[in-house]
């Protein structure tokens, strides 16, 4: 489910379902996808947040399997970016398990 914030951001809560969580390879795929869109992305978990364009920042969120992350995007392609990221996360980052 997506929601628009007063600042125009589109926000969606995504559950991490891949076995290894938001590790280096998954974070790299996330960043590569973000970079395809004209959007600025922020990812939050609990009280921590990171830019969607930072592999290290995403890894520092320590989002393991079963945790939820809040992903917000602004910009002309924010909705498309959020939809693509949701598909990536729910698709286990394309990992075979």
Regions found by a protein language model. Give the residues of each.
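Positively charged, low-complexity intrinsically disordered leader regions
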Residues: 1, 9-11, 18-20
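Short, charged, intrinsically disordered terminal tails
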Residues: 2-7, 93-97
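A broad, low-specificity signal for short, low-complexity segments enriched in glycine/proline
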Residues: 2-5, 28-35, 79
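Intrinsic-disorder/low-complexity, polar/charged segments enriched in Ser/Thr/Lys/Arg/Asp/Glu/Gln
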Residues: 7-13, 68-70
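Compact, glycine-rich, soluble single-domain proteins
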Residues: 15-65, 73
């Amino acid at each position: 489910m997506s929601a628009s914030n007063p600042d125009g951001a589109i926000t969606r809560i995504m559950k991490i379902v891949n076995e290894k969580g938001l590790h280096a390879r998954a974070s790299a795929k996330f960043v590569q996808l973000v970079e395809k869109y004209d959007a600025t992305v922020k990812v939050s978990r609990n009280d921590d947040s990171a830019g969607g364009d930072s592999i290290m920042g995403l890894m520092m969120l320590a989002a393991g399997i079963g945790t939820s992350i809040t992903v917000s995007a602004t910009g002309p392609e924010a909705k498309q970016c959020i939809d693509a990221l949701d598909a990536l996360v729910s698709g286990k980052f394309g990992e075979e398990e």
